[in-house]
Amino acid sequence: MQDHEKYMRRCFDLALMGRGNVSPNPKVGAVVVHQDKIIGEGYHKKYGQSHAEVNAIASVENKNLLKESTIYVNLEPCCHWGKTPPCANLIIENKIKRCVICNKDINPKVFGGGIKLLQDNGVEVISGVLEEEGLYLNRRFFTNQSQKRPYVILKFAQTLDGFISPEGKGGWISNDTMKVWVHKQRTEEDAIMVGYNTVLADNPQLNVRHYSGRNPKRVVYDKYLTLPKDKNVFDNSQETYILNYVKEGREENNIFIKLNEELPFAKQVLEKLYEQKICSIV
């Protein structure tokens, strides 16, 4: 079990290399081990591209060793055709004798089907290795699948005496180091949301300027569409969702999502954003 945990931790390290690029898919890493030596490894690099198991197997130089090897992967191999072929089939085709898994995939298209397919074809399967750590690693994915909503992150800065800004005014209170950290976090999440007053006071850009990576989608709550249209969030530089009670539709990169005033606000916002395939939001 100790060796299983060692190799699973390597899967975690690899999986994290895909953060910010694989949503709505989970972060997955895989290693191929032969006689207690890693002979291949890979991770899911980008949504729509090959999965971790495919990349790990492809990296093995001597394919003859695969039939005597164990593959470690932090999520149950898929068993369905999506944007890529099923990974469980690839493991079977290469006659890999054992597959060690961290978490079962709760996506209804898999949901134990990958494990069953492997076992039915003579592959030994061990699951549940570092299960809790794996759940935390892919907490966004598991929240999406189980609760049908984005994973929500609350971010705020405050002064030592407990204030977040002068009354009615905006402005930075965090330092340059924290600016870099905040922008790094933005690259890893699907969207960032602010309210009416934040747009008025701060005129934020809600993009990534102090770090290298993708811009998140912007989400703005503008109840009756009264925000000035010269604000940065409406500059069409990135996809922006405008939550409101007036209209639906799209104007260039600005997407209007109409809410129902009779329904609970938070619940319908999360449902609407989930429908837009937003899996995590700050």
Residue locations for each model-derived region?
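Acidic, glycine-enriched active-site microenvironments
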Residues: 24-28, 67-70, 280-281
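Short beta-strand scaffold segments in enzyme catalytic cores
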Residues: 27-36, 156-157
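Zn2+-dependent cytidine deaminase-like catalytic core
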Residues: 32-133, 217, 262
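Short, basic/aromatic recognition patches
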Residues: 3-23, 144
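Short, structured interface segments
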Residues: 128-145
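Active-site ligand-binding patch in enzyme domains
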Residues: 143-144, 149, 153-278
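Residues at the N-termini of beta-strands
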Residues: 98-99, 191, 280-281
